[in-house]
């Protein structure tokens, strides 16, 4: 087995590269990975478990938000506490079938924003009025889960939304009644990964945040604790249809209102 000094001298020219080596002390364990970092001509070996960073939003949720939500809504089991399970980002591209370069540019931009390569969304049926054929590419979409989801949500709340032009808070009534929230963007340049000077065309996108909350009130509280800047002086409200007054009803047989 090579000594540590030999490994250090060998890896000095491969800064930032992750190596895999099999140790003789534990042959059944398998591969043990470490990260090499160069600083002033020296190499520092870091274990893989120590090199992995934990997202701050996920850490705050586990350590601070879960106890607050459990106490406020009187959950008997910690598994009842609502959480974000996935985020779906959709981007519609009307001229995708005629402009292949525009489609590739949109895919690259959404991949930079989300950290995951999107998939193409295609038409399921043909609509002659909109010149849409079955199987035609209409847009792209990304489904985020796990650490990528928390990282994207953190950047969306703290970087993208404040950079929106004339931003006064997101609409608190954009819940779907089942604890899921949607927010839209008119242009992708609000994300810091996209440079406005190199963007060829402004493209909007829709972000749907799916949670395990049973009600909009629970989801509203969850996202508020995460830092979602809801519009002040308002909260989630359910649509209530107004009953028609009797004076609005007209009896055709009698020819009068009642």
Curated annotation (Swiss-Prot):
Segment annotated as transit peptide: 1-38
Organism, as annotated: Spinacia oleracea
Pfam families tied to this protein: Ribosomal_L5 (PF00281), Ribosomal_L5_C (PF00673)
Claim: Membrane is one of the keywords in the record: no
Protein name as it appears in the record: Large ribosomal subunit protein uL5c
GO cellular component, one term: ribosome
Subunit structure comment from the entry: Component of the chloroplast large ribosomal subunit (LSU). Mature 70S chloroplast ribosomes of higher plants consist of a small (30S) and a large (50S) subunit. The 30S small subunit contains 1 molecule of ribosomal RNA (16S rRNA) and 24 different proteins. The 50S large subunit contains 3 rRNA molecules (23S, 5S and 4.5S rRNA) and 33 different proteins.
Main location: plastid
PANTHER family (alphabetical): 60S RIBOSOMAL PROTEIN L11-RELATED
InterPro entries: Ribosomal_uL5 (IPR002132), Ribosomal_uL5_bac-type (IPR020930), Ribosomal_uL5_C (IPR031309), Ribosomal_uL5_CS (IPR020929), Ribosomal_uL5_dom_sf (IPR022803), Ribosomal_uL5_N (IPR031310)
Disulfide bonds: none
HAMAP family recorded: Ribosomal_uL5_B
An annotated Gene Ontology molecular function: RNA binding
Family the UniProt entry places it in: Belongs to the universal ribosomal protein uL5 family.
Keywords: Chloroplast, Plastid, Ribonucleoprotein, Ribosomal protein, RNA-binding, rRNA-binding, Transit peptide
């Amino acid at each position: 087995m090579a000594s540590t000094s030999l490994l250090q001298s060998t890896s000095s020219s491969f800064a930032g590269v992750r190596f895999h080596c099999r140790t003789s002390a534990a042959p059944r364990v398998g591969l043990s990975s470490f990260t090499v970092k160069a600083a002033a001509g020296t190499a520092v070996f870091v274990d893989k478990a120590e090199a992995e960073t934990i997202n701050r939003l996920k850490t705050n949720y586990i350590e601070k938000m879960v106890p607050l939500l459990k106490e406020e809504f009187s959950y008997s089991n910690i598994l009842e506490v609502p959480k974000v399970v996935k985020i779906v980002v959709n981007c519609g591209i009307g001229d995708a079938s005629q402009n292949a370069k525009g489609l590739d540019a949109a895919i690259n931009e959404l991949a930079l924003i989300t950290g995951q390569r999107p998939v193409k969304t295609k038409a399921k049926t043909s609509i002659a009025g909109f010149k849409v054929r079955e199987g035609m590419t209409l847009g792209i979409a990304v489904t985020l889960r796990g650490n990528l989801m928390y990282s994207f949500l953190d950047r969306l709340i703290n970087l993208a939304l404040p950079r929106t032009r004339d931003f006064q808070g997101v609409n608190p009534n954009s819940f779907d009644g089942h604890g899921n929230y949607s927010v839209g963007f008119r242009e992708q340049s609000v994300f810091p990964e996209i440079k406005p000077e190199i963007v060829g065309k402004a493209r909007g996108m829709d972000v749907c945040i799916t949670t395990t909350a049973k009600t909009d009130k629970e989801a509203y509280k969850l996202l508020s604790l995460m830092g979602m800047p809801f519009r002040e002086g308002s909260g989630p409200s359910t649509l209530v249809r107004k009953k028609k007054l009797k004076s609005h009803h007209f009896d055709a047989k009698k020819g009068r209102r009642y």
